[in-house]
Design a protein with these regions (language model features):
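Secreted/periplasmic proteins
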Residues: 1-99
Length: 99
C-alpha cells in the first residue's frame, strides 16, 4: 500500500447535522462531497473507495472525527449514498490522499 493510503472502517453522518458548523467553520451539508478525518488538514482531497462494490468518490476534509474506534473516516450522507453503504452504516473503505 502506498504511504498516502489507508484502509479501515468508515461511517457516515447526515441529516441530523445539517446546518451545524463543521470543525473548519463551514455549515454541514449532508449532500456535499465532504468528510471528517481525525488528523488530515482541512481541504485535503481524499479518494474514498468501497472495495465491496468498486465505487469511489473524491471528498474534501472539512470536519474532525470520527471519535469511535476503530473508524478512520466519517463521510457525508451523500457520499455514503454514492459509495453504496447507507443501509449498512459502516464499510471497510480504502482512503487515498490526493492532496
Amino acid at each position: 500500500r502506498a504511504p498516502n493510503a489507508a484502509e479501515g472502517v468508515a461511517s457516515w453522518y447526515g441529516p441530523g447535522f445539517a446546518g451545524r458548523l463543521t470543525a473548519n467553520g463551514e455549515r454541514f451539508d449532508p449532500a456535499a462531497p465532504t468528510m471528517a478525518h481525525p488528523r488530515l488538514p482541512f481541504d485535503t482531497l481524499v479518494r474514498v473507495s468501497n472495495p465491496e462494490n468498486g465505487r469511489s468518490i473524491v471528498l474534501r476534509v472539512n470536519d474532525r472525527g470520527p471519535y469511535v474506534e476503530p473508524r478512520i473516516a466519517d463521510v457525508s450522507y451523500g457520499a455514503a449514498q454514492q459509495l453504496g453503504f447507507v443501509q449498512n452504516g459502516l464499510v471497510v473503505a480504502e482512503l487515498e490522499v490526493l492532496g
